[in-house]
């Protein structure tokens, strides 16, 4: 079956108590590059790696370390994706904007509009091949 809209996971956001430890781990253990920092580099609110990990500083977080904050999905047609998503029973909008959804099990998804042929190019990459 073919679906009219194509999308890919652009990032996964994870709440962490100690953002500096996680930055060091992803850099030093896995060789990942930080591509963006929100806030002062000495005390970042959040950082993004090349490859799609977003670390969100949340020092007071009471849940288990590494709690998923949200999935970020890049799509070729935002309006079509949102219409299809909201057609599912139990999908709710979130306060962040119309492109933020909460699924029935509590998972939050940020749906973003891709530019140009970004989706096609990303889906053409076979990281295992």
Model regions and ranges:
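Generic alpha-helix signal with a bias toward terminal, lower-confidence helices
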Residues: 21-28, 42-46, 60, 67-69, ...
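Conserved short beta-strand elements that form part of the metal-binding/catalytic scaffold
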Residues: 33-67, 101-119
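Core segments of cupin and vicinal oxygen chelate
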Residues: 2-7, 13-54
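Vicinal oxygen chelate
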Residues: 1-5, 8-17, 35, 46-49, 61-129
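N-terminal beta-strand motif that seeds the catalytic metal site of vicinal oxygen chelate
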Residues: 1-23, 66-73, 115-129
């Amino acid at each position: 079956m073919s679906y009219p809209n194509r999308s890919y996971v652009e990032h996964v956001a994870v709440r962490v108590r100690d953002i500096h430890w996680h930055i060091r781990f992803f850099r030093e253990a896995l060789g990942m590059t930080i591509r963006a920092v929100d806030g002062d580099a000495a005390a970042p609110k959040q950082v993004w790696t090349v490859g799609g990990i977003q670390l969100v500083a949340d020092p007071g977080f009471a849940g288990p370390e590494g709690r998923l904050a949200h999935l970020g999905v890049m799509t070729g047609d935002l309006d079509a994706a949102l219409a299809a998503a909201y057609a599912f029973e139990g999908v709710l909008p979130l306060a962040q904007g119309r492109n933020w959804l909460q699924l029935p099990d509590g998972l939050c998804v940020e749906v973003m509009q891709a530019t140009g042929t970004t989706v096609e190019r990303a889906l053409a990459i076979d990281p295992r091949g």
